[in-house]
Amino acid sequence: LAYIGGSITQGAGAAPINTECYAYKSYQLFQKRFSAKNNVKFIKAGVGGTPSELGMIRFDRDVLRDGQQPDIVVIEFAVNDEGDETKGDCYESLVRKVLNLPWKPAVILLFSVFANDWNLQDRLSPVGKLYDLPMVSVLDAVSPQFALKNDEGRVITKNQFFYDMFHPGNAGHSVMADCIEYLFEKIDQAGHASLNAFELGLTEEKILQEKLNLAPVIGNSFENIRLLDKKDIYAKAYIDEGGFDSTDTQLQSVEMDDQLSLTPEFPYNWMYDGTKNTLNRVKAYFELEMECRALLLVFKDSGEVNVGKAKVYVDGEYHFTADPHINNWQHCNAVIIFNNKTSENHVVRIEIAEEDRDKQFTILGFGYVL
């Protein structure tokens, strides 16, 4: 069982974070229901404050690490994707990326909820409907009963469910796990072939494949996205790292799987450090040349005063400025540099703003679609 998502999947609000989070609890419930030998493996890859725009880039590294082939993947980004530039294209791309894996894992879409009874399930649920995926809505499960009194059928109050505005506490994580267990129960009771399998003579896998051949409901621009960093180099990419010759070790780190220890995200990065090396200030740029259809930059946000801005140019034209202080806390930020219809050769230059040459900036990696 694998789980990918934001801070709720990471376990925020649960104590201890590794065993009281919904992911671990639902994995235990799955094992209790289906496993006779306690031989179910648990993969957890939640990263706080990050949307599916980052999730689709880090999926291979974080979920499929060490040759893992999960049979079930739970995707939880319904409260993280408000800032998604593509309004759902990244989410559907991630879903399709998982569904298209050679061993055909099952996918569950999980819609968490904030304390103001908000999530993005109205935007994202059409993706589940198109591919006939099971969807678990925590909003539908808990929000309607919050307004009731005890004698009217209220099961849990908002204060009991939530640790803060954005994250469930231990009780909330337990309820989320119960919601997923309810899905397991329903699936366990259901027949293993859908009605269509008898009518059309097709297996469920073939029906899914036909749906994957249909036009996406939002978009699939990034379903073949790959990660490019110092570890996963693309042979046909030409890189001039310029002054980005250091490696940043002060990174957003998360509790993976059932561990309490922290694992850094994107450790194979390129860091410009103008605080130590004055020679670097002469070469305050990084250049990447490659043929691709789409390219995303992943850079490090930070609240530190010694971190500066970088300007992003494509083929000599200014596109945008990457500013770590907009979010102002240490975390991974994925932004689209370009997303085109056809693949062409481009030169991307990332240049430290002139007034920030004595500061630091970290390129965590790139996501690219050929």
Which ranges hold each PLM region?
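Serine-esterase "nucleophile elbow" of acetyl-processing enzymes
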Residues: 1-45, 58-69, 297, 342, ...
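Cell-envelope and extracellular/periplasmic
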Residues: 7-8, 12-14, 43-60, 68-83, ...
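Alpha-helical scaffolding within the catalytic cores
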Residues: 23-30, 52-66, 88-97, 119-123
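Sec-exported extracytoplasmic/periplasmic mature domains
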Residues: 31-32, 60, 64, 68, ...
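Loop/turn elements at helix/coil->beta-strand transitions in domains of secreted/extracellular proteins
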Residues: 37-41, 68-73, 102-107, 131-134
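Active-site segments of SGNH/GDSL-like serine hydrolases
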Residues: 76-80, 90-126, 130
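Catalytic His-Asp segment of secreted/periplasmic serine-dependent ester chemistry enzymes
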Residues: 115-216
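Conserved catalytic region of serine esterases and O-acyltransferases that act on ester linkages
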Residues: 174-370
